[in-house]
Structures are given as structure tokens and as C-alpha cells.
Amino acid sequence: MTDSLIHTGPFLVAALYHFVSVPRFASLQAPLQALSEENGVKGTLLLAHEGINGTIAGPDAGIHAVLAFLRAQPEFARLEHKESRASKMPFLRMKVKLKKEIVTMGVEDIDPNKVVGTYVAPRDWNALISDPDTIVIDTRNDYETAIGTFRGALDPKTKTFREFPDWVRRNTGLHNKPKVAMYCTGGIRCEKATAFMKAEGFDEVYHLKGGILKYLEEVPQEESLWEGACFVFDERVSVEHGLKEGEHRLCHACRNPITSEEITSPLYEEGVSCSHCYHTRTEEDRLRYRQRQLQIALARKRGQRHIGS
């Protein structure tokens, strides 16, 4: 299934994941890497026993070639993906990695291929999260929720997805309402989170199909309950309604998204510090970052891209 393009740009970006048993996943690494490189495709794909996850970008024909290869594999015949556009290549290289999990929760025996929550289409999401009997949970990390979230959602303020299970177990009040609705960027974390919640005894568990990205694509801004921008894991940094590129930039010292206002802060120095990390880094750290930033600037003058940029 291919979702429609919303924003124009020379590079096609495809976000995908699929939970499915793939005992032979390691055998797909080399052909995927070679095919991607041959077609000018960059990004990251994770392969594991439980499926595939990743985001890739490149020319239209290249992306279509990689997706066609994947769907030619019996396990991925029903693979869905979401498309958007980027004004410049958002990745530096292509990486196909073998993993224990395609999204790391760190809890044994959680299998979304066997037990999972109920999908909710973007057009039905507003009604669900507006229901007073529903607890809404953002399953993303704190640096993501800082720039955008659904109105009224609980923010676990996790640093990594591995912290989510402990947060759930500590917050016994989550059982006080009959319905739990969860969401994430593209759908993979909240899907795995629903499998965990079911295992923890929650009965009515729902998750946003296609994640925030699909919601921002399909739901008109005037009807939207989304507030802010959606963090994405590439050089676009964020996207907004209609999946157009957002205005956030990334602090390359701490990897936090920063606004245009934060760039004017006296604590901001490109590639070296921002208001999020200035007080948690040492002068030695900043000296090292300045040296890296100098190498990036020199690479730009040569018309190249530094690997650390």
C-alpha cells in the first residue's frame, strides 16, 4: 500500500515497518544493501526475527525498486509504507542492520505478531481521544514530545523506549479508565506498546494507524487536535500538517530539536551547544565539538558532506 505524496521535493522519503516472523532475515541484508546503493537510496533499515523497520530516501525509481524487492519476499507482501518529500537528501549513507528487535523495548515474550491492540484510523482518532473514558499516551521520547503532541495526552518523559514498560508499571492509575489510546511517529512503537499493555492486563487498547505522520497527512489542519510539529529521525528534523518540512533544526551537540527562537539564545553555538545542553556539557566537550564543526565547515567549502554533520 502506498500513501499519497503531500509535499513536493526532489527526494522521495519512505517510512515503513512490518511486524512479521522472518526466520531468514539475515539473508536479506546483503541484497538490500547492494540494491539500495545501486539505486542511490540512503537511510536505515532494521531487520530482525520480528520484522522490518526503517526510513529510506532517494530518487523515485530507486525507492520503488527497494520497495518492490521487499514486497517480492513472501513475508513482506503486505508491507505498507508512508511517503513524503524532502528538499535535500536527509541521510548520509545507507545502512541495513541486523537486530534482536526492530524497535527496542527490552521486554521478553512481547510479540505484536500474536497479540496487539486495535487500530484506529486517523479520521476516527479525534473521537477516541476526546472520549472522557480514554487515557491518551504518547509513547515517544521527551525530545520528541517537546516540540509537538496531541492535546491532553500523557507524556511519560522517557529518554528511550526501553523506559516505557517501567513507566506503565509505576503508574497504576492508568487502570482507572477503561480505554487506552496510544500513538507514536509512524506506528511501530505504539503497536509494540499495545502488545505490552495487553500483556499487563489492559483490555481496551487502541493505537493510531500510521502514527502521527498519517494523521498529519489525512486530517485537515482546521480539524486537527495535534499541537506543534512532529519530530522525524532525519535531517528534516520535523514535519507539520500536510507533511511539509518543519522549521526546527537539530543541535548536533545533544541531538535535540531547536526552534528559531532558541537559535537566537546566547547559549547557542552551531554544532557546539544550545539551551538544552549548554549546562550539561564541559568546556572540553565544547572544544571537541568546535573542532568537529570546523571540519564540517571545511567539507562544505569543498562541496562535500562531513560524516558528522
From Swiss-Prot:
Q: Where is the Rhodanese domain?
A: 130-224
The family database entries (Gene3D superfamilies) matched by this protein are listed as: 3.30.70.100, Rhodanese-like domain
Q: Which catalytic reaction applies to this protein? A: uridine(34) in tRNA + AH2 + O2 = 5-hydroxyuridine(34) in tRNA + A + H2O
Classify the source by domain of life: Bacteria
Enzyme Commission number(s) of this protein: 1.14.-.-
Q: Which GO terms describe its biological process?
A: tRNA modification
Output the InterPro entries linked to this UniProt entry.
Answer: Rhodanese-like_dom (IPR001763), Rhodanese-like_dom_sf (IPR036873), TrhO (IPR020936), TRHO_N (IPR040503)
Residue positions of the active site: 184
Under the heading SMART domains, the entry gives: RHOD
One Pfam family name is Rhodanese
Q: Per its record, what are the GO molecular function terms? A: oxidoreductase activity, acting on paired donors, with incorporation or reduction of molecular oxygen
Q: Which UniProt keywords apply?
A: Oxidoreductase, tRNA processing
Q: What does this protein do?
A: Catalyzes oxygen-dependent 5-hydroxyuridine (ho5U) modification at position 34 in tRNAs.
For this chain, the family text in UniProt reads: Belongs to the TrhO family.
Q: NCBIfam families from the entry? A: PRK00142.1-4
Q: What is this protein called?
A: tRNA uridine(34) hydroxylase
- This chain is encoded by the gene named trhO
